[in-house]
Amino acid sequence: MAKSKFKTTFSNDKATTSSTALLKYINKKAPKGYKYEILYKGSDIYSLKKDNTDEKISFLVRFKFPLNFEGIKVTNPQDLLELSYRTQKEIVLDETLQNGSDGQPPTLVSLKGEVGKQSIFPIPFPKLDPIKLEWFGGALEIPIKRIPYASLSEIKLESESDNILHVSFLFNETNNKVHLNTNINFEYLRTIDDYFKFRDFLKNYSEGRVKILSKNITLRSEDNNDKIKIFEKNDKLYNALRLIQSKIDTKIPFPQNLSIKDVNIIKILFESYINDRVVKFKSEPSLKFTFDDSSNFKESFPITGKKNMGIFVPFQRNIKFLSVSIPIIENQLYTDTTVKTADLQDRVLILETNKNNESFVFYQNSEEYKEISINEMLEKKKAAIELDDIDFSVLKK
């Protein structure tokens, strides 16, 4: 049973001291077997209590049962106080009942006017020890706390929000059964490095090998294989990001959300930086290029209408993915195109792709740039991989 604190709200701000004569006067209104005593030192409020009680702090309050508290029908004061504790909600006392009627004395008497709102507040939940998760070769502690829950037979516990795993327990004290719910909190991961701090746990969790309360956390049998496949697929992506991160001077955030554009950039970065492999992709029907003054392309500027033309264009730019921006050299190779516009004055070239057109791209780290010739690019394209076929597998060298 919970202990309770009593709070009385009133407008007085000056302390008063009781006297024997004053108490005698007030106690004339007290029924037989009861007496009024000052509520606490310095207060001007007197509470009605049993005459034979030895408790230092006690008071009498009135309830009218049955009553509804937090959606539950309550029929006795013990359950009301218990439910107040379990829900961490105050009990607001009925002022009419406390003031007394039909000859009943008031439960509180103030020397300076009417007593205002009266409430009983529960004591806070105690702090709990963390729960321990275990798997072969590893362990993890998760802080938990008791959650207010409107029930006289069930207790709810949840993990603290800032953790890799969200855990929720619902204990039924009547039948001693426990309902357990767990979910991975991916928002806890800030960087790709954070993922690898918890990778061993996440892998064992996906395989149903983590123990909690001496039991395995298991996934439903009908989706267990799918969960494992999803973990393996995502794990390859995260490993690719870690490998890319090792090649650039930037920390990569953990991908909470991925756009198709992000995925495609990561694929090309992975094949270029890790596998040293050209990526083949589908180009737009029309390609526009603008060349600067230093370009020697104008020396062999093609004429409009020329067919079966190939073009190799390296240029420097910043690519953005997952809120990261990195400088690269992007090498583009297009085969079998037709010249639609060739503007020598503005140095603009517009090509149309043909049905046999092939398009290739290869990224280079701008800080480690080594110029690639068109012949080298043509040689590299022989081992090119289709963009859609990239699964973040590392080539054996």
From Swiss-Prot:
Pfam families: AbiGii_2. Keywords: Plasmid. InterPro entries: AbiGii-like (IPR053703), AbiGii_2 (IPR031707). The keyword Amino-acid biosynthesis does not apply. Confers resistance to phages by a mechanism of abortive infection. Seems to act by interfering with phage RNA synthesis. Does not act at the level of phage DNA synthesis. This is Abortive phage resistance protein AbiGii. The lineage of its organism: Bacteria, Bacillati, Bacillota, Bacilli, Lactobacillales.
